[in-house]
Swiss-Prot record:
Lipid-substituted positions (S-diacylglycerol cysteine): C26
Signal peptide range in chain numbering: 1-25
Record-given protein name: Uncharacterized lipoprotein MPN_271
Location relative to the cell: Cell membrane
UniProt topology in membrane: Lipid-anchor
Positions of N-palmitoyl cysteine lipidation: C26
Source domain of life: Bacteria
GO CC, any one term: plasma membrane
InterPro entries, per the entry: Lipoprotein_3
Keywords of the record: Cell membrane, Lipoprotein, Membrane, Palmitate, Signal
PROSITE patterns tied to this protein: PROKAR_LIPOPROTEIN
Record-stated family: Belongs to the MG439/MG440 family.
Amino acid sequence: MRKKKFLSRFSFSSLFLLCGTLLSACTGIQADLRNLIKETTGKDIDLSKAIKTKEGKKNIIASLKKSYEVNPKDTTKLLLDAWKQSFEEGKLGIADFDFDHVAYPQTNDPFTMERKVDHFQMTYQSFKDLLVEARLSYTFNWFGDYSSGDFTAKRGDKHYFYLFLKIKSDPKKQFSAKKFLTEGEAFTDQEGKQTTRNLEWIEFSASISWWTKGKDDVSQKSLKKFLESFATNTGYSSDINLFSYLEYLIK
């Protein structure tokens, strides 16, 4: 009984420390952002309130734009620290890696999918030479039997695969103060109608590539069955909204 109590107490303490660490990290980003804006613009913004309104978000982005013009080194570090921290917590900000629209074409296949960030490494001197290397792990949890061709899965089976990711700056679209976007953008919707889309974006144009690998032969078959067209991508350009990571951490 004593041993059981000790383990329960230890688990609770570990959970408390973990929550405290995450809270401290989020608070640290908020404090750094507030101080950076105050130092470079003279504004003292209540971020927790500002982040809840469109005007508040635009004010933060406009202030960060000024900060980047005055102090690009510290502003770059703040934005990339927020990206790294958010990504490690599972906020990827890149829809392609959710795979829901690929793995669930009919939404009736009897499995659920879990994703975890195993490794994330970011190196840079500036946005120009930024390099991100990461490894994500995915698990297919089967809650029913499935059979198609030479592929079968039974209830309770688990299939695992890894995604090895590389992100670099797109050399054709270099980051600059012009990437801090707050104005409306005109575009044509699917019905051909002209409309305006409000923007709260800090746009980083990235070159993204990845490849995937099943943990074992059965998992490799599962990967091929459901994600063959997405198993490897040698590189494409995508715009990543760096502001979404700050928004995630502040909220």
